[in-house]
Amino acid sequence: MAGNHAGPDLLFGFPTIFFGTLAVAGSLGFFFNMKWGRLPKIGEKYYDVIVLTLGLWCLVGLLIDSFAHISGTVDDTFFTPWHAIWYSGATAYGAYIFYVLLPEEGISHMIRNPFESLKGIEPQHKPGVYGIIIFGISGVGDMIWHETLGVESSLDILLSPTHIGLFIGLIMSVSAPVWSAWADPSSGIKGLKSQMLLVFGIGAAWSVILLMFRFANLWIAPIESFCYSSQLNLCKNDRYEDALSIGLQSLYIQAGITSAMLIIFLQRWEPARGSMFLILTFNTVSLFVYTEFDRNVIYMGLVWAILVELALPIYHKLGAKIYIPFIVSTQLIVLIASWYIRASDIANATYWIEGNDLHVLPFGWTIHSTIGSVVICAVIGWLASIIGFPNHQPEMNLK
């Protein structure tokens, strides 16, 4: 059931923001069209810049809308101000893609042969085009879903079928410059400036994926959901095995996601100074929003990003199969260190013994699991790097 709809002020905000931002975008488009003679088509100079800018517009809308859902400040309608930002960006993105696909024969020819233009797109440019199409279809479905079945809250936003379509479409859209540059042998070889589009594309895609898996992220989860203490009421888990299981499940998932996102970048490009820091900064900013602006996340994220950036010589000397495990393990080490500094909020003692087991702060896990969890995260990163960077197979001559 749809429930109660928003009041006049909330509804008024949607058209004002939606059409206002589109008017600004249209004015900028007209300006650059006059300056350049025409806006760039697929594969031309500045095409990837425009696509990424429009994708980031959508991402900002997603972050704002996600915060509204997470904090419970949504109303039971589709037409909210935060949706206006998200969908105005998608409309602008879609309008630009429509322009670049428009054949010389005009709109009538495109209507009669809607798939002809899509067939001619080179493979490296398809994610951006197909992504906004998926996003648009899912957006219409999302409006119908909200107006008939109501608005999701909390973790429900991650499982709404229309939201899943929006997530997939947005990941493809914001990562479009990455796939466009993948086929260009000269991309990303002239320092940080040449890798900015790649960094922003991967970082933005990672932001969406973090939202999809926010239920399994110890940087987001309250510590009482995965800590253990037989002497305190803070921790929700009465059984140690339950606390450890919840924590490990989240660690495994995030270690895999972190490894995968970094492998995409490192498989193709040699990271310039500053690129790894910026990619992880995207991660940090997203988590900051998803935790409802927990400043501790900012501190942890910046420390992690600095450590990874300073460790770049490890990559140059020892390769990705050592560097990626280092990144994944330090992600957990920073979390443990941060909570250990705040250990006074959890218990007066830094350790205690139950039976034959030594339990230590900050999570109350045994010393075996506390140290072993860091090791297993490194192992996950190592296994992922083996898959991402396999040894060259010898040519098989069966004659």
Language-model-detected regions and their locations in the chain:
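C-terminal transmembrane helix-loop-helix hairpin of multi-pass membrane proteins
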Residues: 301, 310-397
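Membrane-interfacial, low-structure loops and terminal tails that flank and connect transmembrane helices
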Residues: 32-47, 105-125, 184-197, 391-399
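Alpha-helical transmembrane segments of multi-pass membrane proteins
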Residues: 26-32, 57-69
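Membrane-interface interhelical loops and short amphipathic "cap" helices
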Residues: 1-12, 41, 63-84, 144-162, ...
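Alpha-helical transmembrane segments of multi-pass integral membrane proteins
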Residues: 50-61, 126-143, 166-175, 195-218, ...
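Hydrophobic cores of alpha-helical transmembrane segments in multi-pass inner/ER membrane proteins
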Residues: 16-31, 84-104, 164-180, 249-265, ...
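Membrane-interface helix-loop-helix junctions at boundaries between adjacent transmembrane segments
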Residues: 77, 114-130, 141-200
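Membrane-entry segments of alpha-helical transmembrane domains in multi-pass membrane proteins
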Residues: 5-21, 43-53, 74-95, 122-127, ...
